[in-house]
Amino acid sequence: MIYQQRNFNIHHIQTSPHKHCYGMGLGVIILDEQYPGFPGDTRNASAYPFPIQYEIAEGLDGKGLLFNADKTSYLAPIQKAAKKLEKIGCRAIAGECGYFAYFQKEIAGYVKVPVFMSSLLQVPLAQNLIGNNQVVGILVFSKNVLTSVHLEAVGIQPNSNYVIEGIMESGLCPEITNLYMASDPLSRGANYEKIEQELITLAVDFYQHHPQMGALLLECSGTQPFARSIQQAIRLPVFSWGTLLDYAYSVAVHREFYGHV
C-alpha cells in the first residue's frame, strides 16, 4: 500500500509548458483571513495523504463571500488564485468554503485542470444514490444566504429531493460559529469536544425532523473533522470536504493497484 502513488515507469522527464513544479496534488483557494483549522479542515493540510498547495483569494473574507449580495468583485481574485495554482502545477483545484459554489462554472471555464469549488458538488451524486423517495440533508453554515445561484452552479435542481439546515440559524452551535464570526481574528479559537458535541446534537435533531433523510452533506469545511462522529450518531452516508478532496485527487492522479492472483 505504501507504493500506491509511486509510478515505477518514470524513465524520462520533460519540461511542461503549462507548469513550473512537478509531483503536485491539489490546489486549494483559501479566504483572505485568519482562523485555525483542526486536522481535516481544508486549510489544515496535515491530515490529507496527498500534496496540497494553498493560494489566497486576496481581499476576500468569509463574511464577504457569504453575506454580500453583490459578489462580482470577488471573481477576479479567485481567478487569479486559480491561475497561480494551475501555473505552479496543481493537478486539480478546490475552494476551501462551500459558498465558493457561486463561482464553480466561472473557475471551471477559466483553467484547464478539474475544479471542485464546493462540497455541494456532491449533492446530485448523493441524490442519485438514495433515490427520489429519500432526501439529502444539506448542513450549511448559514442557510439564509444559500441561494439558487449557489445550487444551480453545482448542478443542484431547486426544489428537488433535499432539505437544508443552517449551523448559525439553529442556535445550537455557538463554538463553531464564534470560530468564524468573531470580530477579532486573533481571538478566534475553539474546543474540539465542544464543536463535536454541538454538531452531533444538530445533526441528530436535523435527522429527527426529516426521517426520510437518506444521506447527509456537510458544506462547511470546518465540519469535516467531525464527519465520522456525526456519521456514527445518525448512521447515514455522509458526504463532506474529505470525500470530495479524496475523489478530486483520485481523478487527477489515479493510483496503481498492487496485489496478487
Which residues are covered by each model-predicted region?
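N-terminal glycine-rich anion-binding loop in soluble enzyme alpha/beta folds
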Residues: 1-75, 142-145, 151-191
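Gly/Ser/Thr-rich loops at beta-strand to alpha-helix junctions
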Residues: 34, 92-104, 117-122, 141-146, ...
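Glycine-rich, highly charged phosphate/nucleotide-binding loops
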Residues: 67-81, 194-202
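N-terminal active-site wall of soluble small-molecule enzyme domains
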Residues: 72-81, 99-106, 110
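Non-catalytic positions within long, well-ordered alpha-helices that form the structural scaffold/packing
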Residues: 86-89, 127, 207-209
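Short, acidic/small-residue loops that bind anionic groups at enzyme active sites
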Residues: 106-130, 232-249
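Charge-patterned, long linear interaction tracts outside catalytic cores
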Residues: 187-228
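C-terminal functional extensions of proteins
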Residues: 219, 223-225, 231, 239-261
